[in-house]
């Protein structure tokens, strides 16, 4: 097979050989076992001005004229780019379905070799060669290897392949019609290639593809069906009004069906729509005379974040439209740019968005025949997203797409021109217009569009300067990087052997050298960017972008331990790092900074003292409010965040759900906003939309709640959880429960299915440290390439998915005496909460209990002291020393403060001896977040205070009660594991039970006490559902009640 390929390559012109080479590269990139005609067709279609793309555009244009009437005939001269885009997506899906090469076959062919050519492709190439010989009588007398196959014959032969025809039918294209158009373009007499042109020194063929439209031939063709022939005749006759886009809009509105125009284009649709609306009163058509234009874009854009409210507002438009119809006889709904419908990361696919589309469809169906029209505009990418997320929108809204190009030129010429220009903004110039990869994720925030791409040239003044220390470190790493690159064998290509012809020499040495140069340049840019950001973050001598308009003098002085794993690229051991700037903080005042003139060099010093009395109080209060809840180290970390408002909103939402892990919430918010703005870690392939976070440490409930909050805030949906071996005692989140559709599928199949269903979701991979070697390798490659294969080898692009990898691994240096106690308490809390238990109210003899050992002096209940000194009073028995005993004598600090005091003098090195996740995973994730052990003391105090308040509100201060230790433990565990509020439960469940008991028993004179205990019994249904929640009722253990 390889010998056949080398022979056939000699018979191809340079253009055809280049197309075949691109197809083989695509097959190799996708790790396919063979190069098929599908790869060649995809490579031919990817060229913006290629022959196949132009022919497909002409075929789509001819097919659409027949249903468009005379008004649309003028527009038929250039097909809409979305037609070819749909064909590209179909080819991409077909390539994704092809199986990947087996490991043994890949090793046999070699790492750098291209996949072999399939039998179907060899047959297509031989058909093209035979057709080339038959088409030129002079070529029939030449040797077989002397006949050079032109690109046109290669395209025609590829279109004859059954697999290519099937894919084109899926995209509503006819391969016979496309082939007929190409043959018509070749029907004009042209000189046959001479023998001299077929030598090895021949230049490009005379029939190279041209971006100009293909000429139409008047001769009939057997491949062209009568409908397409009639459509081509109408198009060749030319319909009037093709050059006036505003006239096209009015003509569409006068049609009996598909009468609501949507103007699609990357430049000019808004101006065309305004011109059409201006012409409506003076158009001279009775149907449009006196129609009232109702602008809705501004109102709908305000509701873009709340699709449910948008659907309700559209439903309320019925009364307004009915009133305007009675007054004016006609209404034109100006919907404006449709980006309000698909704006946001997950808004396009939400139920609210579908409801908005359905409500607008019902409104137009109700009044459509009575004189109501809808007009709107959309960019090409926006319209494509509308068609993807709302496939039935065109039919429900009765839309008719009107392509708009710059300057009124045909849309095909405008799209091709913008694709050929370096800065073109046409749809063919976007990243989604190429097949490698087939479908790149779209940016979801305007900030991502404004961020300069990696490797872009910037002026030295625009880049932050580095101090001498960081510059020296940067130069040392740069020299080491260049030395490693020089030592690689690929950087020293062998000299070509002059005795062999060019087609037998190694042709990939130059390509490898260019790839190495590009990779080295990207590595240098990334290294420089890393050191500039590091210097700007930890050294105050370098100014940063004014993301925070707050002087560092107002920052909180106490530095906490950074709650994330800072993995240095190329370091042998990943470490938990502290900011070195906290070792010797500066104490210089900032008065000189504020009084320095603008032209003087600015130096920001960290000040650990209060502002001078002369500071403006209003400015100081405003700064304190903006920095409330953030520590000094966190402010230093987020100093480079461009979208500070989004960071604050995300941090607030995460902290409200998991208040005891505020440091982890701050680190998560910072890395998410940085990645969404384009400054995340680039894993060898440039900036991508997917994100990888690693949650390490204990507190499984905190991780689960953090993931829930992150998914609701970023994707407006529940997270998808795939368990690779996590703790089964915790209730599942997201949709990880039993599902009939998941039977027979592996865990990776579930991940790929979730990505296909929603490319903007949050996916949790629990127990990532327990996966096998195969799954570990696939996840690692997904981090590097942005594509994840399923069990059948079909790859899926990761889109804008946020992946959260969780593990219970705890760094060795966090395992101190106090931390070990907290970990044991968390384990016991999980075991007790997962068991069957019930709360019970009873009356017993009053006994003086010793004070709970876990209570500190400052939180000892006053009512307990009252009971010890008098027979009447409030008795609170809380013997809860087991879960949170502080082994440090005289220490009553929380876990965070204790850990900080133990770790302030050095770094927390993560040793390889611990069962840590793989070092490759640590180096590839965007960030690794450390969750600290949970200190349940604040939880217990909150629960006991709330329960005490309910008892006292019913019984008053003259009676005694006691809460059992196990009861408090179980209630604390339920509050920790669920989202339930203890205050709501105590008011609606516990208080009625206390009132019932108190009003139905005799009140003894202080000799009896009411007790709230936890008993092991068959558990009642839980408050709010689940199995870890608080009980829906509290039983009363008294006879007759």
Curated annotation (Swiss-Prot):
Residue ranges of the region described as Repeat 2: 117-188
Q: Which SUPFAM superfamilies match?
A: Double Clp-N motif, P-loop containing nucleoside triphosphate hydrolases
Location of region: Disordered: 189-214, 482-513, 889-913
Low complexity compositional bias: what residue ranges?
A: 189-205
The highest taxon in the source lineage is: Eukaryota
Q: So what family is this one in? A: Belongs to the ClpA/ClpB family.
The record, for PANTHER family, names: CHAPERONE PROTEIN CLPD, CHLOROPLASTIC (PTHR43572), PROTEIN SUPPRESSOR OF MAX2 1 (PTHR43572:SF13)
Functional summary from the UniProt entry = May act downstream of MAX2 to negatively regulate karrikins/strigolactone responses. Acts probably specifically in the karrikin pathway. May function in a transcriptional corepressor complex.
Q: This chain belongs to which protein, by name?
A: Protein SMAX1-like
Which source organism does the UniProt entry give? Oryza sativa subsp. japonica
